[in-house]
Amino acid sequence: KGKYHGLPIYEMLGGACRDKLKVYCWIGGDRPDDILRQAQEKFAQGYRAVKMNATEELHYIDTYDKVDAVLGRVAAIRDALGNEMDIAVDFHGRVHKSMAKILAHELEPLRPMFIEEPVLPQNNEALREIAGHTAIPIATGERMFSRWDFKSLLSDGYVDIIQPDLS
């Protein structure tokens, strides 16, 4: 209908609702020593948000040494750049529900922008419980491929950000 009327679809849906969009830059995280340097480089380039891999694969119940390592990586950025840099933490589904609840709770004082894919999509029912243990927004969706995969996430409201992989 947009082509027929010679209008962009967003105009047919009521018009533009914003003229800016916040973007983030991926900085890795598999090499913890590089995290702070990369975040500082992105900040110098004008980015005000980064996403990082702060976790390695964790056991169902793991040690607080590993939790502290995650906190240390995120805290290094927060301490160096303050609240001017938003930090998203991608779990890549490497974490089981029990550890995801602990990590989300422990990360709260560092004020992440969001946590991404705390569990794999096959375990999306765990997101409800994880969401109940944190105020941090939860993002997921890059490994979900149909509208039916997203239906319960949207209707139940326990995910704040959906990230379909359009490629």
Indicate where each model-derived feature is located.
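Short acidic active-site motifs
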Residues: 99, 125-126, 148-149
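Beta/alpha (TIM)-barrel catalytic core signal, keyed to glycine-rich beta->alpha loops juxtaposed to Asp/Glu
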Residues: 145-154
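A short acidic, amphipathic alpha-helical/loop segment
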Residues: 38, 126-129, 152
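Glycine-enriched alpha-helix->loop->beta-strand junction motifs that scaffold or abut catalytic
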Residues: 46-48, 81-83, 105-113, 129-138, ...
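N-terminal capping/lid subdomain adjacent to the active-site entrance of alpha/beta enzymes
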Residues: 1-87, 94, 98-101, 105-109
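Catalytic beta/alpha-barrel core
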Residues: 51, 88, 92, 111-121, ...
